[in-house]
Amino acid sequence: FVTGEYPVIKDVETAATGLLAALEESDADRIRELVLVDQRTNTVVTHRDVGIGISQVLPVLVMAYGSQEKLLAMEQPEIHLHPALQAELGDVFIEAALGSRQNTFILETHSEHLILRLMRRMRETYQRKEMGLPPVTPADVSVLYVEPDGTRSIVREMPLNELGELVKSWPGGFFEEGLREQFDDA
């Protein structure tokens, strides 16, 4: 990983050319291909051989586990992932934020599964259940809901209590979709 402070780049094209030359001169022999192992079949595969969700989440995992004491902003880190893996991603963020890495995350998500996992871990912390993860409290998680209002957007804080429950009613449309699919008659 690159560390240190660097000046603002004003001429992007010249800087990119210089970086490419430096990469070709010093790092070309160290570049490796990432391979994965399908645990069901014990088969080695590349990121190109797996679903798009797995290849999309790899940079998220690298940033979460490869960074320390950083502010990391991610847009829809759960995109194209199976719902169970979206929930597991919640545990990744808990570990990377509240464990030894101490990262801070700003996540833009549409995933009920990811949010529900954070809420569950908060409840398990309060109930003193062993999770194998750092404890999660309401002070550790801030849920913001952004909704359009004409030509502007309104940001609403949606606080959680120690049981991981929403203190305020959720604005319409988010958690309602799953309930509507389960219980509404057509």
Task: Provide a role label for each language-model segment.
Residues 2-6, 15-22, 26-182:
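Switch/communication elements of ASCE P-loop NTPase nucleotide-binding domains
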Residues 9:
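Conserved helicase NTPase catalytic core signature
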